[in-house]
Design a protein with these regions (language model features):
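Venus flytrap/periplasmic-binding-protein-like
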Residues: 108-120, 228-272, 281
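Short, solvent-exposed amphipathic alpha-helices that sit
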Residues: 36-52, 142-149, 175-194, 212, ...
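Short, well-structured alpha-helical segments in soluble
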Residues: 67-83, 92, 99, 210-222
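Extracytoplasmic "Venus flytrap"
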Residues: 24-44, 48-49, 57-71, 88-92, ...
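Periplasmic-binding protein-like
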Residues: 26-28, 79-89, 107-112, 166-167, ...
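Flexible loop/hinge segments that line or gate small-molecule binding clefts
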Residues: 99-141, 263-264
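Hydrophobic alpha-helical segments within soluble ligand-binding/sensing domains
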Residues: 68, 133-163, 209, 259, ...
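Hinge/cleft segment of the Venus flytrap/periplasmic-binding protein
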Residues: 168, 285-355
């Protein structure tokens, strides 16, 4: 009996130890707690953490960098520090957080907006910061895809004719917005018949884009195409066009990034001609990397420490309808590299949710 009791105690202790040793993660979410993209991003991240046995806490900054830094200070300098801190280099905030992290013992993973080349040069100054890597989506390709697909939807342009384009970028100090702009300009270089009449920074905000578009559409009434770096700005610009008595998808063709219910509905009813999405999954895939790193996997050997994932894809009507419905559950544990051969590469893709 004593042996049985001792065995039970040992088993219970082992189970408790496994729970106690579950890697803890804090995610510094740069968005608002009411912002569809960042909420869905965190939800997918939580699903990954739950499946992988990670303890994840999400801290929303409500689009305020000072709040982000306060949350970082609490996580890195307070009691009960996490094993990992996941952050976004929104408005170039990463170096300040890396400075705080020196000597904390907390490992950092950067997602969505990686370090800029200038910031990367500062890494040697943070020699005691445990940065395990970064993972971003192919934002430049997203910007490129939007314009090239808009032109495909528009159809042939008569010889000697031109098309006027209006563009809404995000925030000047957000690397993802800059990269999407670069993709736009690459597409423009390939299609000189398209004239970019004006590019403005809508700060990812619907109301701001609505106000900007109201003036831009008056200034450039012949505009045929609108390129938008996210869904909120596209919806604001669409409303401005509708208020002028014109019809989105007929009089002017719109494009957008993201997969919120409202923008998916616009894709389904034809108001939106081109939609690119997929990067809301980044946080979930980051959980797989953290799980594996905590298990001793050299994640750098499986695609590099700083990885760019080809996550963006054009969302056709059938796919938009699929994304509007209940999402297919993802077996995150099956994506882990634990126990896989050295040749294994993470198959991160939106297709895991669509098939």
């Amino acid at each position: 009996m004593l042996k049985v009791l001792m065995a039970c105690v040992w088993l219970l202790g082992s189970a408790y130890g496994a729970i106690a040793q579950a890697a803890s993660v804090v995610f510094l979410n740069p968005g608002r707690s009411s912002e569809t993209f960042w909420v869905s991003y965190a939800q997918f991240m939580q699903a990954g953490a739950k499946d992988l046995g990670l303890d994840l806490r999400v801290r929303y900054s409500e689009r305020d960098n000072q709040v982000t830094l306060a949350h970082a200070r609490e996580a890195l300098l307070g009691t009960g520090r996490p094993d990992y801190l996941v952050l976004v280099n929104e408005q170039y905030v990463a170096p300040q957080i890396m400075r705080m992290a020196q000597g904390s013992g907390v490992k950092l993973l950067i997602v969505n907006n990686a370090l800029t080349p200038d910031q990367t040069q500062l890494l040697d100054a943070y020699h005691d910061t445990r940065l395990i890597g970064s993972m971003v989506a192919d934002d430049e390709q997203a910007g490129y895809l939007m314009l090239t697909d808009l032109l495909r939807q528009h159809g042939p342009i008569a010889s000697g004719a031109t098309l006027d384009l209006l563009a809404f970028s995000g925030a000047k100090t957000t690397p993802a917005a800059q990269l999407r702009e670069q993709g736009l300009r690459r597409a423009l270089a390939e299609h000189p018949q398209v004239r970019l009449r004006q590019l403005v920074y809508g700060e990812w905000n619907r109301q701001r884009a609505y106000e900007q578009a109201t003036q831009m559409l008056k200034r450039y009434p012949q505009s045929a195409l609108v390129w938008s770096a996210n869904d909120e700005m596209a919806l604001g610009a669409m409303q401005a066009l509708q208020d002028s008595g014109r019809v989105p998808g007929k009089d002017v063709l719109f494009s957008a990034v993201n997969s919120s219910p409202q923008i998916l509905a616009a894709r389904l009813d034809g108001r939106l001609s081109t939609l690119v999405a997929g990067h809301f999954t980044l946080g979930g895939w980051a959980m797989v990397l953290i799980h594996d790193e905590a298990k001793g996997v050299d994640i750098g050997a499986l695609g590099g420490r700083n990885r760019q994932q080809a996550l963006f894809q054009l969302i056709e009507v059938a796919q938009a309808r699929r994304l509007m419905g209940p999402m297919r559950s993802v077996e995150f544990r099956a994506l882990s590299a634990v126990g896989k051969p050295p040749s294994y590469r993470y198959p991160f893709s939106l297709q895991l949710l669509l098939r």
